[in-house]
Structures are given as C-alpha cells and as structure tokens.
C-alpha cells in the first residue's frame, strides 16, 4: 500500500475541490495513484472536473523572439528562485541574450542552449546569489507569426494564414487567457478522447439509462469536451457570442499552430537553502 501523504491529499483537494476525507478515501482506493483517484471520483460524481497537475511555483520570465520576416520564432523560459530576481535588470538582460541567440542560431535543443551559456549563467548565479536555469525552448514557423506576453510570466506565439497583425494578436491574447491545448477538436489525440469517453460513459451508465441512450448522451458531452480543449472550439474571450473558429472564418483565416508557455508550468519550486546547497557542493568538490 502506497503512503498517502498530507501533500498528496492536499493536491487532490486542489485539483478536484472535494473534501479532505473524500480525497483521502479515493487515494487509498487508488493505492496513491492521484490520476486514477481523479478518474474514479469523476465517475462517482465526487469531482465533475479536475484541474491539471502542475502548480505554478517557480519564478522567472518567458520571452518570445520573431525573425524579421515574421515567419520563424522561438519562445524561451528562464527560471530563478524569487520574484525579486525575475525583475532584476541583469537577469532580464541575460534572458534576452539567450532568447536572441536561440532565434539567430535556431537553437531548439535545450542542452545545446544551456551549454552555450553555461559560463555566463554561472557568473550571474555568483553575482546574484540565486540559482538560474534555462528551462525550455521551442520554435514555431508559419506564414505569419504573432506574439503576446502577459507580465513576462505568460508568453504565446501563434502561426496563422490569412490573418492580419491585429487579429493574430487577439488570438494570442485569447490563448494566454483560455489555455487551449490543441488547434482544432479533431487534433485531440485518440487516446485522450478514448479516456474521456470511457469516463463519460461510466457516468452516464450510472444514471440507469440503457447503453444506447447513454452513448447518445456521451456524444454530446464529447463534443463539448473536444471543443473546450481546442482553440477553434472555445468561445472567444473578447466576444463570447462566437467561437474562435467562427471568428477565423469571418476573416478567412486559419491558425496553423501555437505555443503557450507559463512560468513554472509542471514544476513546483523546491524550498531549499541555496547557500547551504553551494556549501554542500564545495565540500564535495
């Protein structure tokens, strides 16, 4: 039996909104597997939906850089330990230099990018007194690229055809706010669809309806699900009366791809004493 820790119960509560005892029971039944616990809670009606894993706990900045022709761009995440350093001029200048190099040399391998700037990073760490990490980099190509940055913590890059700069900017702002995972409903992977379909079918069957009626109920729920996780299926944040897909159709435009980075996605900042860490490293040297 896996150990059911308080932090595991806390995470399940945060992701489902369910009570502490319900979460602890679900984790015990799932032998500590939080994803299985969430599935079981959804099937039983204890959790209607679940937030994605990965609390944003790291500090840092997201930078986007686009080539002069507007057809190629990169997006980079740089992490530090505190918000104070994230606003430091030296840290921001270093991050900008890294992003500029990634664009100029088309460096999208994170290890290559880290190696290129390791000496400068080490010097900056010694100067600032905090750990700094070049966390990830990605690229995007297209007929026209647009970007949006929200307070340096969220960065979006969009590739589109048939769109002007204003439209693509609005689409990027929508992506920053609504967090779509795919461009179109049909882009949702088959395994993701199958997983959600099974959950919705189990929920529908518990209502006592015959299977064929339950299947019909699930069809509607699945259309809603794929719409909610895809850009074109979402209601446009600036005009909820239409979907992003309808907006694009009005302008005879298409989105061919997008990237959305948010500082600290998928990681939780480990509370460590950096001075003690450096001291420990010195002893081991």
Curated annotation (Swiss-Prot):
Q: Name one GO molecular function term.
A: translation elongation factor activity
UniProt lists the family membership as follows: Belongs to the EF-Ts family.
Supply the alphabetized keyword list.
Cytoplasm, Elongation factor, Protein biosynthesis
Taxonomic lineage: Bacteria, Pseudomonadati, Pseudomonadota, Gammaproteobacteria, Enterobacterales
Q: Which InterPro entries match?
A: EF-Ts_dimer_sf, Transl_elong_EFTs/EF1B, Transl_elong_EFTs/EF1B_dimer, Transl_elong_Ts_CS, UBA-like_sf
Renumbered residue ranges of the record's region Involved in Mg(2+) ion dislocation from EF-Tu: 82-85
Name of the featured protein: Elongation factor Ts
Species of provenance = Edwardsiella ictaluri (strain 93-146)
Cellular location of this protein? Cytoplasm
Please describe what this protein does: Associates with the EF-Tu.GDP complex and induces the exchange of GDP to GTP. It remains bound to the aminoacyl-tRNA.EF-Tu.GTP complex up to the GTP hydrolysis stage on the ribosome.
A GO term from the CC aspect: cytoplasm
């Amino acid at each position: 039996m896996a150990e059911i820790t308080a932090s595991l119960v806390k995470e399940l509560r945060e992701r489902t909104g369910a009570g502490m005892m319900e979460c602890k029971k679900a984790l015990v039944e799932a032998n500590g597997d939080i994803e299985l616990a969430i599935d079981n809670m959804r099937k039983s009606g204890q959790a209607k939906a679940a937030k994605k894993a990965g609390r944003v706990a790291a500090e840092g900045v997201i930078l986007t850089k686009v080539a002069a022709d507007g057809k190629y761009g990169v997006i980079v995440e740089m992490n530090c330990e505190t918000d104070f350093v994230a606003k430091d001029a030296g840290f921001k200048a270093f991050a900008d230099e890294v992003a500029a190099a990634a664009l100029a040399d088309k460096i999208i391998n994170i290890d290559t990018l880290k190696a290129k700037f390791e000496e400068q990073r080490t010097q900056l760490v010694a100067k600032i007194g905090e750990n700094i990490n070049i966390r990830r980099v990605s690229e995007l190509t297209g007929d026209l690229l647009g970007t949006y940055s929200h307070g340096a913590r969220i960065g979006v890059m969009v590739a589109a055809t048939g769109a002007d700069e204003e439209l693509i900017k609005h689409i990027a702002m929508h992506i920053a706010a609504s967090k779509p995972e795919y461009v179109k409903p049909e882009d949702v992977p088959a395994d993701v669809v199958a997983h959600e379909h099974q959950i919705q079918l189990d929920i529908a069957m518990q209502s006592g309806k015959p299977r064929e009626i339950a299947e019909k109920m699930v069809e509607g729920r699945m259309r809603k699900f794929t719409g909610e996780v895809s850009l074109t299926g979402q209601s446009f944040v600036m005009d909820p009366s239409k979907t992003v897909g309808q907006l694009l159709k009005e302008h005879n435009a298409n989105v061919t791809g997008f990237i959305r980075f948010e500082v600290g996605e998928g990681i939780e900042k480990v509370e460590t004493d950096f001075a003690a860490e450096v001291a420990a490293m010195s002893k081991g040297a």
